[in-house]
Amino acid sequence: MPNANEPRFPTHVAIIVDGNRRWAKQRMLPVSMGHKAGFDRLREITRYAVGDRGVFVLSLYVFSTENFSRDAKEVGYLMDLFANNFRTIADEMNERGCKVLFSGRREGLQQRVLDAMDYMMDLTKDNEKGIVNFCLNYGSHAELTDAIRAIAAEVKAGTLEPEAIDEKVIEKHLYRDLPPVDLMIRTSGEERLSNFLLWQCAYAEFYFTDTLFPDFTKECFDKALAEYARRDRRMGGNTKK
């Protein structure tokens, strides 16, 4: 099993958390129970990936900008999960010396969710052993739109010359200036990015599994890491990475 000290170990792993509703449907349970099971699994995988396996950055796609179009009761339950559990996750990550960040638009989120998010970030802001990046009310198109608007405002204000705009400038205006994604994992059998970290995934390796997220165990995560270690990453060139 690859470890964090080996060259073929991913620095940044991103997971599209998918399959909670199908998990509940298969068991003839309410959708809310699927989300609860998925959130419990998310806490376990977060502790394991960053705290035990040594992944430096873990990005989790937990709620997209498009998810607000779902049934209001389901959205409300998800907001309850976030508001009621983020503080516990903050304590767990703080004990492990890991920082918690959020990527996404704050507009539209309930104040109690924002308060829990701010608590997590404030409590863990000085930690350096790893980063957990919760992507909440996130969409890559929205992120790039917001980045372009911010850059345009700087050009208009005269603080940035158009000729100075390059990839690094764009990256600094994304929600978070993090390393590029090395490994993108999607559960539930779907094989698409669904508007997640499009810029950051330029050279990512993709790992798709039929496993629904509530069933995505530590062993499943290790299997994804092992598959990544077998990949021949050339990053557009001839040199293996």
Language-model features, listed with the residues they occupy:
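Flexible, compositionally biased loop and terminal segments
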Residues: 1-241
